[in-house]
Regions:
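A conserved beta-strand element that flanks and buttresses the S-adenosyl-L-methionine
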Residues: 139
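Short catalytic micro-motifs in class I SAM-dependent methyltransferases
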Residues: 142-146
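Local beta-strand N-terminus motif with an aromatic residue
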Residues: 65, 135-136
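Class I (Rossmann-like) S-adenosyl-L-methionine-dependent methyltransferase catalytic domain
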Residues: 1-85, 92-129, 150-152, 169-238
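Residue-level marker of regulatory loop/turn positions in helix-turn-helix DNA-binding domains and
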Residues: 132
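Conserved helix-to-beta-strand junction in the class I
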Residues: 159-165
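A short, conserved alpha-helix within the catalytic core of class I
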Residues: 147-159
Length: 238
Protein backbone atom coordinates (compact mmCIF):
# COMPACT_ATOMS: atom_id res chain seq x y z
CA UNK A 1 0.00 0.00 0.00
CA UNK A 2 1.40 3.41 -0.97
CA UNK A 3 1.85 6.13 1.65
CA UNK A 4 -0.70 8.30 -0.17
CA UNK A 5 -3.26 5.52 -0.20
CA UNK A 6 -2.68 4.77 3.48
CA UNK A 7 -3.05 8.44 4.46
CA UNK A 8 -6.34 8.75 2.60
CA UNK A 9 -7.74 5.49 3.93
CA UNK A 10 -6.84 6.50 7.48
CA UNK A 11 -9.35 9.36 7.12
CA UNK A 12 -12.02 7.89 4.86
CA UNK A 13 -12.25 4.48 6.54
CA UNK A 14 -10.85 4.90 10.04
CA UNK A 15 -11.75 8.45 11.08
CA UNK A 16 -12.46 8.66 14.82
CA UNK A 17 -15.89 10.27 14.35
CA UNK A 18 -17.78 7.69 12.29
CA UNK A 19 -21.00 9.71 12.01
CA UNK A 20 -19.02 12.66 10.63
CA UNK A 21 -17.25 10.35 8.17
CA UNK A 22 -20.58 8.96 6.99
CA UNK A 23 -21.99 12.47 6.58
CA UNK A 24 -18.96 13.54 4.53
CA UNK A 25 -19.34 10.38 2.45
CA UNK A 26 -23.00 11.19 1.72
CA UNK A 27 -24.66 8.26 3.49
CA UNK A 28 -28.42 8.30 3.19
CA UNK A 29 -30.15 9.26 6.43
CA UNK A 30 -27.00 10.50 8.19
CA UNK A 31 -26.29 14.10 9.18
CA UNK A 32 -27.17 16.49 6.35
CA UNK A 33 -28.65 13.58 4.43
CA UNK A 34 -31.49 12.93 6.85
CA UNK A 35 -33.25 15.16 4.34
CA UNK A 36 -33.82 12.49 1.69
CA UNK A 37 -34.79 14.97 -1.01
CA UNK A 38 -31.45 16.67 -0.54
CA UNK A 39 -29.65 13.33 -0.74
CA UNK A 40 -31.47 12.27 -3.90
CA UNK A 41 -30.89 15.68 -5.49
CA UNK A 42 -27.16 15.00 -5.83
CA UNK A 43 -27.72 11.99 -8.06
CA UNK A 44 -30.52 13.65 -10.01
CA UNK A 45 -28.23 16.57 -10.81
CA UNK A 46 -25.47 14.24 -11.99
CA UNK A 47 -27.89 12.37 -14.23
CA UNK A 48 -29.21 15.62 -15.72
CA UNK A 49 -25.63 16.59 -16.65
CA UNK A 50 -25.14 13.26 -18.39
CA UNK A 51 -28.35 13.62 -20.38
CA UNK A 52 -27.54 17.22 -21.33
CA UNK A 53 -24.10 16.21 -22.56
CA UNK A 54 -25.56 13.38 -24.60
CA UNK A 55 -27.76 15.93 -26.37
CA UNK A 56 -24.78 18.25 -26.83
CA UNK A 57 -22.92 15.48 -28.62
CA UNK A 58 -25.98 14.95 -30.84
CA UNK A 59 -26.06 11.26 -30.10
CA UNK A 60 -29.27 9.52 -31.13
CA UNK A 61 -30.30 8.18 -27.74
CA UNK A 62 -29.08 7.73 -24.20
CA UNK A 63 -27.44 4.27 -23.98
CA UNK A 64 -29.65 2.19 -21.73
CA UNK A 65 -28.77 -0.06 -20.08
CA UNK A 66 -25.20 1.19 -19.79
CA UNK A 67 -22.04 0.37 -17.85
CA UNK A 68 -21.06 3.08 -15.37
CA UNK A 69 -18.06 3.54 -13.12
CA UNK A 70 -18.04 5.97 -10.23
CA UNK A 71 -14.86 6.90 -8.40
CA UNK A 72 -15.80 7.50 -4.79
CA UNK A 73 -19.50 6.52 -4.63
CA UNK A 74 -19.74 7.21 -0.89
CA UNK A 75 -23.24 6.30 0.24
CA UNK A 76 -24.50 5.78 -3.31
CA UNK A 77 -26.62 8.79 -4.27
CA UNK A 78 -25.47 8.65 -7.92
CA UNK A 79 -25.97 4.89 -7.92
CA UNK A 80 -29.50 5.40 -6.64
CA UNK A 81 -30.28 7.88 -9.43
CA UNK A 82 -29.04 5.53 -12.16
CA UNK A 83 -30.26 2.21 -10.81
CA UNK A 84 -32.79 1.67 -13.62
CA UNK A 85 -30.45 2.87 -16.38
CA UNK A 86 -27.42 0.62 -15.80
CA UNK A 87 -26.74 -3.04 -16.28
CA UNK A 88 -23.48 -2.76 -14.32
CA UNK A 89 -22.38 -0.04 -11.91
CA UNK A 90 -18.78 -0.19 -10.70
CA UNK A 91 -18.07 1.71 -7.49
CA UNK A 92 -14.39 2.39 -6.77
CA UNK A 93 -13.45 3.36 -3.23
CA UNK A 94 -10.73 3.06 -0.60
CA UNK A 95 -13.39 2.55 2.07
CA UNK A 96 -14.86 -0.94 2.53
CA UNK A 97 -17.57 0.65 4.68
CA UNK A 98 -18.70 2.93 1.86
CA UNK A 99 -18.82 0.06 -0.61
CA UNK A 100 -20.81 -2.05 1.85
CA UNK A 101 -23.27 0.82 2.33
CA UNK A 102 -23.75 1.11 -1.44
CA UNK A 103 -24.47 -2.61 -1.64
CA UNK A 104 -26.89 -2.43 1.29
CA UNK A 105 -28.72 0.57 -0.13
CA UNK A 106 -29.11 -0.70 -3.68
CA UNK A 107 -30.09 -4.20 -2.53
CA UNK A 108 -32.81 -2.61 -0.41
CA UNK A 109 -34.01 -0.94 -3.62
CA UNK A 110 -34.34 -4.35 -5.27
CA UNK A 111 -31.22 -4.33 -7.46
CA UNK A 112 -28.88 -6.73 -5.70
CA UNK A 113 -26.96 -7.69 -8.86
CA UNK A 114 -26.34 -4.18 -10.18
CA UNK A 115 -23.45 -2.93 -8.06
CA UNK A 116 -19.89 -4.21 -8.39
CA UNK A 117 -17.64 -2.94 -5.58
CA UNK A 118 -14.01 -2.21 -6.43
CA UNK A 119 -11.86 -1.79 -3.33
CA UNK A 120 -8.55 -0.06 -3.90
CA UNK A 121 -5.76 -1.64 -1.90
CA UNK A 122 -2.69 0.07 -3.32
CA UNK A 123 -3.10 2.40 -6.31
CA UNK A 124 -5.68 3.53 -8.89
CA UNK A 125 -4.59 0.89 -11.40
CA UNK A 126 -6.06 -1.74 -9.05
CA UNK A 127 -9.29 -1.37 -11.01
CA UNK A 128 -7.81 -3.07 -14.08
CA UNK A 129 -7.99 -6.45 -12.35
CA UNK A 130 -11.75 -6.14 -11.78
CA UNK A 131 -13.25 -3.94 -14.52
CA UNK A 132 -13.20 -6.33 -17.45
CA UNK A 133 -15.60 -4.56 -19.80
CA UNK A 134 -15.37 -1.08 -21.32
CA UNK A 135 -17.44 1.52 -19.53
CA UNK A 136 -19.96 3.91 -21.10
CA UNK A 137 -19.97 6.52 -18.34
CA UNK A 138 -17.43 7.74 -15.77
CA UNK A 139 -18.55 9.83 -12.78
CA UNK A 140 -16.70 11.43 -9.90
CA UNK A 141 -18.36 14.14 -7.83
CA UNK A 142 -16.77 15.84 -4.81
CA UNK A 143 -13.92 13.31 -4.72
CA UNK A 144 -10.92 14.70 -6.63
CA UNK A 145 -10.68 17.45 -4.01
CA UNK A 146 -9.89 14.80 -1.39
CA UNK A 147 -7.08 13.11 -3.29
CA UNK A 148 -3.70 13.26 -1.53
CA UNK A 149 -1.95 14.86 -4.52
CA UNK A 150 -2.49 16.16 -8.04
CA UNK A 151 -0.49 13.23 -9.35
CA UNK A 152 -2.92 10.80 -7.70
CA UNK A 153 -5.75 12.36 -9.70
CA UNK A 154 -3.75 11.96 -12.88
CA UNK A 155 -3.23 8.27 -12.09
CA UNK A 156 -6.99 7.91 -11.61
CA UNK A 157 -7.64 9.38 -15.06
CA UNK A 158 -5.06 7.07 -16.62
CA UNK A 159 -6.76 4.08 -15.02
CA UNK A 160 -10.14 5.26 -16.32
CA UNK A 161 -8.74 5.71 -19.82
CA UNK A 162 -7.60 2.08 -19.72
CA UNK A 163 -11.19 0.87 -19.18
CA UNK A 164 -12.84 3.36 -21.54
CA UNK A 165 -13.81 3.02 -25.18
CA UNK A 166 -14.46 5.54 -27.95
CA UNK A 167 -17.49 7.53 -26.85
CA UNK A 168 -17.15 6.99 -23.10
CA UNK A 169 -18.54 10.06 -21.37
CA UNK A 170 -16.96 11.55 -18.25
CA UNK A 171 -18.25 13.94 -15.58
CA UNK A 172 -15.70 15.02 -12.97
CA UNK A 173 -16.12 17.70 -10.34
CA UNK A 174 -12.92 19.27 -9.03
CA UNK A 175 -12.00 22.06 -6.67
CA UNK A 176 -10.21 24.72 -8.69
CA UNK A 177 -7.18 26.74 -7.66
CA UNK A 178 -7.56 30.48 -8.20
CA UNK A 179 -4.92 31.57 -5.72
CA UNK A 180 -7.19 31.41 -2.68
CA UNK A 181 -5.02 30.03 0.12
CA UNK A 182 -8.00 28.15 1.56
CA UNK A 183 -8.14 25.90 -1.49
CA UNK A 184 -4.46 25.44 -2.27
CA UNK A 185 -3.26 21.86 -2.69
CA UNK A 186 -1.27 20.36 0.14
CA UNK A 187 2.46 20.22 -0.50
CA UNK A 188 3.30 17.41 1.90
CA UNK A 189 1.45 14.26 2.90
CA UNK A 190 1.79 15.23 6.56
CA UNK A 191 -0.84 17.93 5.89
CA UNK A 192 -3.45 15.47 4.64
CA UNK A 193 -5.24 14.55 7.85
CA UNK A 194 -5.76 18.19 8.81
CA UNK A 195 -6.64 19.40 5.31
CA UNK A 196 -8.31 16.37 3.69
CA UNK A 197 -11.44 18.39 2.83
CA UNK A 198 -9.40 20.81 0.70
CA UNK A 199 -6.34 18.66 0.02
CA UNK A 200 -6.28 18.88 -3.77
CA UNK A 201 -7.09 21.48 -6.39
CA UNK A 202 -6.18 22.25 -9.99
CA UNK A 203 -6.13 25.44 -12.01
CA UNK A 204 -8.92 25.35 -14.58
CA UNK A 205 -6.61 25.34 -17.60
CA UNK A 206 -4.31 22.85 -15.86
CA UNK A 207 -7.06 20.26 -15.46
CA UNK A 208 -8.23 20.80 -19.04
CA UNK A 209 -4.69 19.98 -20.20
CA UNK A 210 -4.49 16.97 -17.87
CA UNK A 211 -7.62 15.54 -19.47
CA UNK A 212 -6.09 15.95 -22.92
CA UNK A 213 -2.76 14.49 -21.80
CA UNK A 214 -4.49 11.40 -20.37
CA UNK A 215 -6.31 10.71 -23.63
CA UNK A 216 -9.65 12.48 -23.22
CA UNK A 217 -11.29 15.30 -25.16
CA UNK A 218 -12.69 18.02 -22.86
CA UNK A 219 -16.07 19.35 -24.00
CA UNK A 220 -17.04 22.01 -21.49
CA UNK A 221 -16.84 23.29 -17.95
CA UNK A 222 -20.06 23.93 -16.03
CA UNK A 223 -21.48 24.47 -12.56
CA UNK A 224 -18.69 26.80 -11.41
CA UNK A 225 -19.29 27.68 -7.76
CA UNK A 226 -17.03 30.51 -6.63
CA UNK A 227 -18.01 30.09 -2.97
CA UNK A 228 -16.38 26.67 -2.65
CA UNK A 229 -14.31 26.67 -5.87
CA UNK A 230 -16.16 23.82 -7.53
CA UNK A 231 -16.11 23.24 -11.28
CA UNK A 232 -17.43 20.29 -13.27
CA UNK A 233 -15.60 19.09 -16.38
CA UNK A 234 -17.45 17.21 -19.10
CA UNK A 235 -15.33 15.16 -21.49
CA UNK A 236 -15.34 12.07 -23.64
CA UNK A 237 -12.99 9.43 -24.97
CA UNK A 238 -12.25 9.64 -28.68
Amino acid sequence: MSEQHAAAQDVWERYEDEEWRQDQSHWRGVGRWKDDKRWQAIGKHTLSKLRATWRLLDRPHFPEPFVALEWGPGGGTNLFAMQRLCRTYYGVDISPSNLAECERMITQEGHSNLFTPVLLTAQPSDILAIVKEPIDVFISTAVFQHFPSKEYGIEVLRAIKAVSKPGTLGVVQIRYDNGNEKFRSITDLSEYRERHITANSYQIDEFWKILRDTGFSPLMIRDINAQVNYATFIFHCT
